[in-house]
Amino acid sequence: MSETQLLDLPVDILYLIFPYLDVTSFVALTSTCTALHQPDIAQYAPYWSSAARSTFRVPNQPVVENDGVRWQKMYRRLLTESRCFTWGNNDETCLGHGHQQHMGSPFGRGGIGPAGRRRPIVRARQHVSWPTEMEGIEKLGIIADMQCGGWSTNLLTSKGGLYGVGVMDGQARNQPAKPSPSPLRYPAGLPHPSERYEPASAIKQFSAGRYHVLALSDAGYIWSWSHMNMPALQVKFLNFELTVRENHSSSTPGYVKKVVAGWSKSAALIVGSGIVVWEPIKRNARQPEGEEDAVLVMETAICPGTDFQRSVTSFEPSPASIDIGEVQNFICLEEYILFNTHLGKVYAASIVWNAQSKAVSDVREVPLGTDGETKFATDVQGSFRSFAIFTNDGTVYTGDLGEHLHGLFRTTMRPLDRIHALQQTQVISIAFGDYHFHALHAPGYITSYGTEPQSCGSLGLGGHGNPEGQIRGLRYQGVSGDGRLVPHASLHGRRIWFEKEKQKWIAFITSGGRDPEEAKERMRMLSEVNVQGEVSEWFEQEGNAWEQRFGGDNTQSEDDLGTYFALSVTAAGWHSGALVLVNENKANKIREACLQDPVEAPEGETAMGEKASGQEEQANNRGFLNRAFDYAGDIINWFNGSPRTDTEGPGFRDPNNPDAFVNPQNHGAVAEDGRAYVWSQDSFPRLRLANGQEMPGEVEFSEWRLGRPEWQGRVEGV
């Protein structure tokens, strides 16, 4: 009998062998010959997905779980390149940026301050509109997941350790804020995973709610935190027993598949029971820490029809659940449970929780599509009052409690929304805050939607109620300065940019560019919504082509991922965050390409730095940034048709002076080392508008990089 060669085996047999190989062995095997290096083997999705999730504890993403190339690239770069960015309202230091000097926002939580008169203040930044890296992350190791709570940002490391910044409950008086990542603690006797591995405390999956965090450990324990400074409580139930994972399969009754911390409830998907809901538990602040390490939850409610398991024969599921199907994913909203099943259907159930009743109503199917359409749902995501439903053809539906779920249970449900920018654009996940939300797309970029309360920066698009935000498509309204995106932004979305150089570029151009007087009339036209929408779209195309503009043909890394590649996005309340892979080598090259070559200066004088230094000393010691932003304030007033402020003061820079903004002391034209940016001679764009109107000016018309979009009939309100 002849020996069987490895390559003689059917590919299905090879797939059964792969899970027993570590990554080094798998790569070595698939590199031995051409036959094994074929994409369907070398980039086998189940292998790389499992490797990434088991090694780094990265949460599964159902929409791309079969994308082997993505999982392979993620595995390679997670080792060295993951960064945590946050933005939005920094109440209780929930962004993790610490205390530093910054230019204050013209809008405070209480109303409008003097436009543009932003003085440097040393305190925690109240509003952050541009993504900024969290501080103190490097010492934690590899970050696998991050989630925002109502007043916190929480991180999971590849070792299974949880850390948080801010406070769990911003309405409680006894919770001091944590400005830097602090470990979430366990009862006495259990180590934090940063100390040593212990299955009972190493976290496999976690969820951040409004004011509490739920986590599922490797051993199958459910842990609940309601205070940054106090140990967790283990959750146990009176009505059923949970299974410790050791020596038990995932089909064993009592096995916990997932936990979700909702707006005001906790929930878990448990084999044999279904989706179980309970009131979040809290540790008594006055009780000694050593007295209590677990809580027996007396009152629970089970979502009907959610106990069916295709691979389980050890118990008899309820008859209704067989038709509903096996739960694939679920979310816990303010008043509802929403879940999708393996049959491609989505169901909702109302949570009834009062003194008379603790129950979850019978489920109702959420209709997808229109008459004649058949949609197969693959995932549900959401929080608080908003949700999204994904289908296998790339359709993404969005909805909320008031407009949709209330109608489903009371009268007639209005059709779910389909935002144009989310359809067939490879959306992986959607993260919802109170009034804003973000979409993560498979190519690694994030788009923003909704409203930015009090110009808090939650959309991550830049600006604080000023032209920098307006040029990204934000219209500021009311006394509090709420920012709402123009309708045009729903066609392709507005991307979040991580490069600081783009912020400099935006600041320079929105201040009039090289000749503010020449651009004055064009800038004033932005008060009209359609003009603002078109100009913001032009800037969107230019900013999205940043690597093409400044990186040549070598801006993609060897695995074709972008310089900034977002792995996940999260949002809650008025703030947001993202876990991003950053290729520092590529980022530095692009950063350098944004700068002009140093200019040879006359003898005894460096080209621009010495001149700037002399002018600083003569300007009443006001400081570089103060004078730059005073000038920006004059631009804002001028843009709005208001009188200039402090026209006699030493810091006043006349916008009519075309040379004012190429001076290195003014923001956006020159880098800290004195070198000018390549856009320091650019003008504010001049466009031919969709209605046939030509923007006034003396400069050449600006060309559309990707062509002017057709908004008519595709975007509501245009």
Write out the residue ranges for each language-model feature.
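Beta-propeller domains
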Residues: F85-M134, S158-S182
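Conserved core positions of repeat-based scaffolds
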Residues: T86, S152-L155, G164, H212-A215, ...
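Solenoidal tandem-repeat scaffolds enriched in leucines and small polar residues
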Residues: S201, F206-W353
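Consensus positions within tandem repeat domains that build extended binding/scaffold surfaces
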Residues: D91-E92, G150-S152, V167-G170, R210-H212, ...
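Blade-level signature of beta-propeller repeat domains, shared across WD40, Kelch, NHL, RCC1
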Residues: P443, P453, S557-A619, F629, ...
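Skp1-binding F-box subdomain of Cullin-RING ligase substrate receptors
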Residues: S2-G88
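Conserved blade-ending motifs and adjacent loop-strand segments that build the rim/top face
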Residues: D371-E373, R410-A431, G460-L567
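F-box-proximal linker/hinge
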Residues: S50-D91, H97, I112-V122, T132, ...
